[in-house]
Swiss-Prot record:
Main enzyme class: ligase
Cofactor binding comment, as recorded: Binds 1 zinc ion per subunit.
Similarity comment text for this entry: Belongs to the class-I aminoacyl-tRNA synthetase family.
Record key words, sorted: Aminoacyl-tRNA synthetase, ATP-binding, Cytoplasm, Ligase, Metal-binding, Nucleotide-binding, Protein biosynthesis, Zinc
GO molecular function: ATP binding; cysteine-tRNA ligase activity; zinc ion binding
Protein name (record): Cysteine--tRNA ligase
Localization annotation: Cytoplasm
Subunit and partners: Monomer.
Gene responsible for this protein: cysS
Enzyme Commission number(s) of this protein: 6.1.1.16
Length: 466
């Protein structure tokens, strides 16, 4: 049984899909006017992992993640660069895929662009106007929040409190300060489409509501995104979607926490961000994913070079174990397991059970990773040159099986690990000859930190995993 923390009801709930064995999941994607930063990247990695885990548990997942390709920021960027909004969108959608692929983020079932749904959006807006939930002023169309009972139920705020909130724009033409634009009249220099209210473009909130409804249906299983989208974006999506259809919009709402730098939220507006591409130039995707999944997805994560280095060392420990098993598979002479080994292999299932228990509990990736470390500690100790090829192979398959939903630990180290260690040993031997004992000790300690111990023997230096 999978339990998820439902932001809507402020508690963990058993996940029961609308259709048995299927998950309809919508995740708010990027506004494509720039490269995405690692704070956005955490959101994409988290929900990629959750999608993978549902699939691991046997669900068929329809996973939709949109591109916002018409927006104030995109218009500003296009005007600054003397190009069109479409060209800006085309460019940064391509760049998104490059970076997301590099982070081993699986492609969505569908990545809709808002501009591909203008006709559907106009129908959606007209439906709200016809039902009395929206009104037109000078070519702009606003959603009337007071008409929708329960506005504020996601963010847990009442409408009176929200009216004085700092994020609400003041416009005297609106009937209420809380009302928000679902269609915007054209301004000079802006792209626009013909509508019953004149030339204009959609508001941001209406885009996701429309795409989710069109691609997944009136009620979906999971709507997800960063916690900064809870209000007003997701609150407004609920209001306009449920006002139009009369049905619950999403049964479960999942939100990932911020990535912070110096205890401040990472954001482009604060100029304290690092793009995913910048980090990928220096660290492997497994390292970045490890860091992003090393804390529970609802827990804020501080981003620093030290934490990246720590994640790198942790990933290396796991790949050292993988490399050790790969080498044993090549080196051991006995093919099949004996009865004792079969019993030992069966005992390793306790780590898989612990992993599933933790992931079933609102996708606790941090504790699931701990289960993988416990597994490799066991295999490093008990699978040796005297073991069978079959046992080493089965243990390796189990490590990879548990790593797959996390999007990690799938690469082969064959040849690379041994060559790297032998090169470091040779460097250490030369340092000792040169009487540079500080360097020799540093190399020994570095190898030890990676789970490799050196033994000086009459035949030379040997190494083994611990």
């Amino acid at each position: 049984m999978i339990k998820v923390y439902n932001t809507l009801n402020k508690k963990k709930e058993e996940f029961i899909p609308l259709t048995p064995g299927e998950v309809k999941m919508y995740v708010c994607g990027p506004t494509v006017y720039n490269f995405f930063h690692i704070g956005n990247g955490r959101t994409f990695i988290v929900f990629d992992t959750i999608r993978r885990y549902f699939e691991y548990r046997g669900f068929k997942v329809d996973f939709v993640q949109n591109f916002t390709d018409i927006d104030d920021k995109m218009i500003k960027k296009a005007n600054e660069e003397g190009t069109t909004v479409k060209k800006i969108g085309d460019t940064y959608i391509k760049e998104y895929y490059q970076d997301a692929d590099a982070l081993n983020i699986e492609r969505a079932t569908v990545n809709p662009r808002a501009t591909e749904f203008i006709g559907e959006i106009i129908k959606f807006v007209k439906g709200l106007v016809d039902k009395g939930y929206a009104y037109e002023v000078d070519g702009d169309v606003y959603f009337s929040t007071k008409k929708f009972e329960g506005y504020g139920k996601l963010s847990g705020q009442n409408i009176e409190d929200l009216q004085s909130g700092a994020r609400i724009s003041v416009d005297e033409r609106k009937k209420d300060p809380m009302d928000f634009a679902i269609w915007k009249a054209q301004k000079p220099g802006e792209p626009a489409w013909n509508s019953p209210w004149g030339m204009g473009r959609p508001g941001w909130h209406i885009e996701c509501s429309c795409m989710a409804k069109k691609l997944l249906g009136e009620t979906i299983d999971i709507h997800a995104g960063g916690s900064d989208l809870k209000f007003p974006h997701h609150e407004n999506e609920i209001a306009q979607s449920e006002a139009l259809t009369g049905e619950p919009f999403a049964r479960y709402w999942l939100h990932s926490a911020f990535v912070n730098v110096n205890n401040e939220k990472m954001s482009k507006s604060l100029n304290n961000f690092f793009t995913a591409r910048e980090i990928l130039e220096r660290y492997d995707a497994d390292v970045i994913r490890f860091l992003m999944l090393s804390a529970h997805y609802r827990q804020q994560l501080n981003f620093s070079e030290d934490l990246l280095e720590s994640a790198k060392a942790s990933v290396e420990r796991i790949y050292n174990a993988i490399g050790n098993l790969e080498n044993l598979i090549d080196e051991v002479s006995r093919e099949e397991m004996n009865e004792e080994e079969k019993a030992y292999l069966e005992s390793l299932n306790k780590y898989k059970e612990k992993y599933i228990e933790k992931m079933d509990d609102d996708f606790n990736t941090a504790d699931a990773i701990t289960a993988i470390f416990d597994l490799i500690k066991d295999t490093n100790t008990n699978i040796t040159i005297d073991s069978s090829k079959e046992l080493a192979q089965k243990a390796l398959e189990l490590i990879r099986e548990l790593g797959a939903p996390l999007g990690m630990f799938q690469k082969s180290t064959k040849g690379n690990l041994e060559e790297e260690i032998e090169a470091l040993i040779a460097k250490r031997q030369q340092a000792r000859k040169d009487r540079d004992f500080a360097l020799a000790d540093k190399i020994r300690d570095e190898l030890k930190d990676r789970g490799i111990v050196l033994e000086d023997t009459p035949q030379g230096v040997r190494w083994k995993m611990i």
